[in-house]
Each structure stands twice: as structure tokens, then as C-alpha cells.
Amino acid sequence: MGLTLLLLLLLGLEGQGIVGSLPEVLQAPVGSSILVQCHYRLQDVKAQKVWCRFLPEGCQPLVSSAVDRRAPAGRRTFLTDLGGGLLQVEMVTLQEEDAGEYGCMVDGARGPQILHRVSLNILPPEEEEETHKIGSLAENAFSDPAGSANPLEPSQDEKSIPLIWGAVLLVGLLVAAVVLFAVMAKRKQGNRLGVCGRFLSSRVSGMNPSSVVHHVSDSGPAAELPLDVPHIRLDSPPSFDNTTYTSLPLDSPSGKPSLPAPSSLPPLPPKVLVCSKPVTYATVIFPGGNKGGGTSCGPAQNPPNNQTPSS
């Protein structure tokens, strides 16, 4: 009864409160939903709120705050009074027949008033059909056993060409790096040998010619060295097997026990002395030695107190 009276009042006051106001235009595709909020005065908190659809014969109520706000079966419009002067209306699963003009109304102390008007336009599902067609074409392309290629996507051969070129470029860079490293290592080794040869040449030229003996023979360590590398070999001292040493009296003048004969000792290996000082060679004649005047030549150090050995 109350709703009937409200509709009658709306028929009489159709233009009151909405003169000069235009409805809000909303557009939504088929199957979507809209959410509309309406503001009312705080004095109308306990008043009845209605969401209705404007028709030529009047405003048809769709949902009201006075009834159960739970969603019944088949209902696609919901009204919620949030309090504080805010009313919220939601329409879900829109269809083409839902297009039209809607409004929020409140039955307050001043009578029925329209709070907000909405003009809803439902878009046809053309875009959705095109999207569905594109999706079905993609599914058919993937499900085709013949492997029909999509013209929008490049083939597998076209995709593999950049990968092949990238691999070739990477291999070329690696080969160039290895060759450059080998050339630098060889050049560095050649420079090192040249510096060593110049150092040895300068050292040989600075030494006393009388103290240096160059041996170039077919045997010994000098034969194993290359001809382009300068080398030095000093004469080794005479062996203890010489008859000059074996004929010397080895009795100690102080009565100490004499040392064993040198011939009983193992021969010492030749010593190679590299020294920058000149070496003095002298002939020493031991008294009481070999009557035949046998002498032995060998390297001798400088005598102490600057005394020159007799010859």
C-alpha cells in the first residue's frame, strides 16, 4: 500500500526536484555490472529508500530498503543503506533489456524525492564475439596436427636465424681472443730472450780477457747451448790425481797425524767459479818434489801480504 501511494505521488510530482537536472549516462557491456551511489540527508536515515526504473506510466520499484536485502533467486539488483547519508545500488549480469533510466528515491519528511538519476546504455557484445573468434582461431592453430603456422607469428626457422648468428659471432670472438693471446705471449717471450742475450753480451765485454776462456767444442755443456746465445766457461782446477800432488811429502811438521793420501779420496767434481775479479795463474815448484822438474799449472789465489810466489 505504501509503495502504491509512493508511485501515485511520483506521478503527480514527476517534475518536482528534477527540473533542470540531467541523468548520469553509464555504458556497460552485456554480462557486466554497475555500482551506483546516492547521497541523502541525515534526517532521512530511517526513511525508506527505493531504486526504481522510470517508465512512461511511472517509476517501477525494483528493490527497496524496507524489504529483505538478501539476494533471492533470480534477483540481479541489490540495494544497501551504508548509513551516514550514503545509499549503494548494484546491478549485476546486465542484459540488453536492462537499458533505460533509473533513479534513487527516498520517502523523507518532505515527501518522496529523487536523489539521483542514471541513464544506462548496454553495449552489444560485438567486441566479445571478435575476441572469441580470435581465441578459437588460436586454439585451432595449436590443435591442427599439420602444424599450420599463424601468419601473425614468425615461423620456427625465422626465430632460429638470430640464434645461429649470435652463436657464430660468439665463436668468432672466442677464436680472435685466443689468437691475440697467443701472439702476445710469443712476442713477450721473444723480448725476454733478446734482453737476456744483450745482458750476457755486455757482461762478457766488460770482463778481463785474460780471465775468461771461451770454449767452443763439440762436447760438454757449451755444445748443448745454441750458437746465438753467448756463454762462458772457466777452466777447472787440476785434478788431485796429478803426479805432482802424489809425490809430495805429506808428513805434518808439528807431529800431527797426516791426512790420508789424496789418491785415496774420491776425485772432486770440477768447480766453475764466476767472479768479476781477475784470476792470477802461476807456476809453483815444490821443493823435494819430482826431480825431473815436473810442474803443475793451476789457478792460485793471490798470496797473503802481497808476496809473489817464486817461479
Swiss-Prot record:
Entry membrane topology: Single-pass type I membrane protein
Location of this chain's protein in the cell: Cell membrane; Cytoplasm
Organism this protein belongs to: Homo sapiens (Human)
Topology feature Extracellular, residues: 16-162
Residues linked to a lipid group, S-palmitoyl cysteine type: 196
Residue ranges constituting the Ig-like V-type domain according to the UniProt record: 16-121
Protein name in UniProt: Trem-like transcript 1 protein
Highest rank taxon of the organism: Eukaryota
Cysteines paired by S-S bonds: 38-104, 52-59
Entry GO MF terms: transmembrane signaling receptor activity
Tissue: Detected in platelets, monocytic leukemia and in T-cell leukemia.
InterPro entries given in the database record: Ig-like_dom_sf, Ig-like_fold, Immune_rcpt_domain
Topology feature Cytoplasmic, residues: 184-311
